[in-house]
Amino acid sequence: MAGVSVAEYLGQRTDVDDLQINPAVVGAPCPFMDGRKCHKKIPVCSIRNKGKLWIVCENRLCSSKKTISDPFNPRRKLKLPLSSYQKKVLLEIARVSFSPHLQFEHVAVKREVPLKANDQSDYSADFIMTLFEGKTALSGPDRVVLEMQGGGETSNTGEITRHLIAWAENPQRTNEILRQEIPKVGTIETNAWRRQQEQFFVKGNVALMTWKGYGIIFCVGELLYDYIWRKIENKAVLPTLEEHNWTLAFLEICEDEEQPSTPGPLPLKIGRRLFTNYQTFVHALINQGEPSLDAFAGEFDRLDGSTVNIQRDGY
């Protein structure tokens, strides 16, 4: 295992040296939300693995949190306004998914929306997105479940913590030290996608069964997009339905390397995209594995302690 490096620290990219990054104070404001403090002790927003971005903070890509505690009455919840950053992200998603001509006033969202499931489990959509009239003459669904998964957890997280503590305590600290490779740490795409699969099946079904049938959009980071594509690329021919009646979209959120390198957050963009049929994609997901005759034949242990060799044909 090679390692990872810190890409963003409390909203500041680490790969530029124009502005010296200093250790964050407890309760510093989150740079990606309005009126919210950073909840992390070590405020790393994203890391790089083999040069590709992996988001490790739930608020970095586009937080769906809709309320905040009243500072004067903690039992009371106040509506949390969307930040300018969140609005830009959501507008870009809408432009790619519906029409490139949309403006802020055309797009409407609901956040943390409860969804019904047969097993009584609690599910909620990150966002429900539609146009302000609730319907559209454009191709694709009128309304969609919108899910955000820019990354997830890492292995050996303690190594990242130790690196950040050593950097913070170093009186000669620099951005270069902050972005040094942290060995023996990796991203865990398998866990990130495994956690999302149940959500994917339930929320996608809810969207398709509602009214005349809606759709679902997954915004995922570059490494997760790579992982999902490897799972299904040889399992099915997925129709490209961007200009037709798509019910599922995968949008890759990646670093916009064409933008100038200036202090602040890393600029993001929508890279690869897949607009297709939800049911066809589900079939590709479950159509994993191949016939494994050797697994069902050969030497078996009998319960009396002896062994028996069973042939493939059962005789």
Regions inferred by a protein language model and the residue ranges of each:
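Nuclease-adjacent, charged terminal/linker segments that flank catalytic cores
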Residues: 1-117, 284-315
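Non-catalytic C-terminal interaction segments of nucleic acid-processing enzymes
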Residues: 1-35, 168-315
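Short, solvent-exposed loop/turn segments that connect beta-strands within catalytic domains
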Residues: 134-141
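Eukaryotic short linear interaction motifs
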Residues: 136, 153-156, 225-227
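A short secondary-structure junction signal
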Residues: 141, 156-159, 228-231
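A general structural motif
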Residues: 141-142, 213
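Short beta-strand-loop-alpha-helix junction that forms the active-site gateway
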Residues: 148-169, 186
